[in-house]
């Protein structure tokens, strides 16, 4: 094993903030800057650990995306796309509205992930963190769910093709990772695992537990849909019941982890009822899985998370902290960070690493929800183990 001069690489550049549909859009990459500055102000991230993203090439994008789609994104970048084309490629609504240089800014997000893949595979670092990425809804030929290019799927395919790696994608975002799933639905070199709020009530409406892959890919797609208002104990129980059997059986060479933090009860777009407790625990458990099964090789992405002031910075900080084996934080946030950003925030900034829970609503049906979730999780774990025999 090669020696790692710095075990963990953290992708950041102000260029990543340019991925912005419009000023009122809920997907706001300012959350990445808030997180990075929080880590720096708390002396938890060293400038030497920061790496710059490159721009992914067209050939790299087309590991997953169709040629005509990539060309359409280029045209949209310069405002020269017809209404019919925009509709065909999912660029005709507020969700995925066109913006200047969208191809370059989207390809930079992909390039950040590929930069980490090369660093890890060359032995220069052990693991990496790309919180500006995690665009799991983008389809091979269509934009979807705030996502233009699917950096996770491209990275998985890149690792499989260039380095002959078996790749496991673990997605804990509140929304089902549909674009990633469909990219590998008939593939047995990449396994996708997604635990999410049921699609009965939430975009994109997919991710049913019966979606299990097809042909040689059967059994390489695992979905764990949870009931609305699921709380910490149930989420973590179902996650641990179902994810480790997948890792143990598939035997990946590397893990790609999607850390959407929209399972938090303060997130405005979802209906789960988790706290920072879950969001702190999840990446540490994924890190344990990587240490136990992939010799520590893991790339952790961002994902959803739309309360950018009170939730995302603290939660995403712990994604990075899990990689560098730092403990979960407690106590006061750096005053320097609070004093800078309180003038920009639309709400009162948190003062501590912990949730105050002063506005947390306990759900009367907690027991019923938890029992239903556990029953499904046990069924999924049993099914999965039966497919591997």
Curated annotation (Swiss-Prot):
<dbReference type="GO" id="GO:0004407">
    <property type="term" value="F:histone deacetylase activity"/>
</dbReference>
<dbReference type="InterPro" id="IPR037138">
    <property type="entry name" value="His_deacetylse_dom_sf"/>
</dbReference>
<dbReference type="InterPro" id="IPR023801">
    <property type="entry name" value="His_deacetylse_dom"/>
</dbReference>
<dbReference type="InterPro" id="IPR003085">
    <property type="entry name" value="AcuC"/>
</dbReference>
<comment type="pathway">
    <text>Ketone degradation; acetoin degradation.</text>
</comment>
<dbReference type="GO" id="GO:0040029">
    <property type="term" value="P:epigenetic regulation of gene expression"/>
</dbReference>
<dbReference type="Pfam" id="PF00850">
    <property type="entry name" value="Hist_deacetyl"/>
</dbReference>
<dbReference type="InterPro" id="IPR050284">
    <property type="entry name" value="HDAC_PDAC"/>
</dbReference>
<protein>
    <recommendedName>
        <fullName>Acetoin utilization protein AcuC</fullName>
    </recommendedName>
</protein>
<keyword id="KW-0006">Acetoin catabolism</keyword>
<comment type="similarity">
    <text>Belongs to the histone deacetylase family.</text>
</comment>
<dbReference type="GO" id="GO:0045150">
    <property type="term" value="P:acetoin catabolic process"/>
</dbReference>
<dbReference type="InterPro" id="IPR000286">
    <property type="entry name" value="His_deacetylse"/>
</dbReference>
<comment type="function">
    <text>Role in growth on acetoin or butanediol. Involved in the breakdown of these compounds used as a carbon source.</text>
</comment>
<dbReference type="InterPro" id="IPR023696">
    <property type="entry name" value="Ureohydrolase_dom_sf"/>
</dbReference>
């Amino acid at each position: 094993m090669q020696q790692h001069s710095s075990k963990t690489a953290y992708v950041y550049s102000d260029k990543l903030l340019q991925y912005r549909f419009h000023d009122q859009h809920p997907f706001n990459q300012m959350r990445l800057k808030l997180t990075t500055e929080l880590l720096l102000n708390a002396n938890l991230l060293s400038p030497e650990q920061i790496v710059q993203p490159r721009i992914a090439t067209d050939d790299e994008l087309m590991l997953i995306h169709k040629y005509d789609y990539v060309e359409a994104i280029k045209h949209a970048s310069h405002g020269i796309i017809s209404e019919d084309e925009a509709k065909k490629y999912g660029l005709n609504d507020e969700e995925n509205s066109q913006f200047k240089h969208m191809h370059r800014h989207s390809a930079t997000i992909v390039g950040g992930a590929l930069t980490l893949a090369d660093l890890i595979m060359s032995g220069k670092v052990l693991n990496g963190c790309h919180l500006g990425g995690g665009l799991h809804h983008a389809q091979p030929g269509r934009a979807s769910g705030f996502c233009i290019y699917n950096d996770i799927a491209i990275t998985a395919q890149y690792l499989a093709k260039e380095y002959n790696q078996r790749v496991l994608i673990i997605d804990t975002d509140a929304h089902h990772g549909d674009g990633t799933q469909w990219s590998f639905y008939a593939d047995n070199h990449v396994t996708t695992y997604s635990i999410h709020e049921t699609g009965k009530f939430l975009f994109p409406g997919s991710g049913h537990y019966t979606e299990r892959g097809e042909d040689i890919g059967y059994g390489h797609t695992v979905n764990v849909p949870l009931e609305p208002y699921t709380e910490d104990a149930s989420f973590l129980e179902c996650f641990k019941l179902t994810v480790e059997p997948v890792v143990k059986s598939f035997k990946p060479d590397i893990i790609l982890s999607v850390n959407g933090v929209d399972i938090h009860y303060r997130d405005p777009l979802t209906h789960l009822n988790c706290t920072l407790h879950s969001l702190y625990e999840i990446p540490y458990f994924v890190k344990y899985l990587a240490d136990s099964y992939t010799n520590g090789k893991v790339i952790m992405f961002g994902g959803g998370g739309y309360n950018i002031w009170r939730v995302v910075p603290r939660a995403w900080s712990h994604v990075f902290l899990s990689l560098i084996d730092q403990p979960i934080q407690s106590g006061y946030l750096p005053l320097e960070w609070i004093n800078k950003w309180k003038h920009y925030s639309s709400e009162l900034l948190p003062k501590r690493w912990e949730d105050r829970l002063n506005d947390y609503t306990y759900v009367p049906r907690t027991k019923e929800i938890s029992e239903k979730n556990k029953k499904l999780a046990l069924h999924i774990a049993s099914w999965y183990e039966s497919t591997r025999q």
